[in-house]
Amino acid sequence: MDLPSHSINAMKSMEVIDINTGTKLGLIKDLKIDTEEYKVISIILPGSKVGGWFSKGNDIEIDWTDIQKIGVDVILVNGDNLFVNKD
C-alpha cells in the first residue's frame, strides 16, 4: 500500500488554513525536524510584518499534531494552539 506523500517544495506552495476560523494563515516558510526521531515537529509560517518593508515579523509555529488534513493544494490546521515565535 502506498502512503500519500508530499515533497517539501510542494508543501511550501500550499495555503495553510485554520479550520476553526477559516483564516488563511499563509504559506510554509520552514519545517522544524527532530533529527533523532526522523520526524517533523512543526511547520513555521512567516508572521505579519507591521511597520514597513524592512521590519521583521514574528513567525507562527504550528505543531505537527495540529495539522488536521493535507490536501492537494491546502493544509488544514487546528489554530487553537498557535505559537508566535519572537526571535
Swiss-Prot record:
PANTHER family: SPORULATION PROTEIN YLMC-RELATED. Gene3D superfamilies: PRC-barrel domain. Belongs to the YlmC/YmxH family. This is Uncharacterized protein CA_C1697.
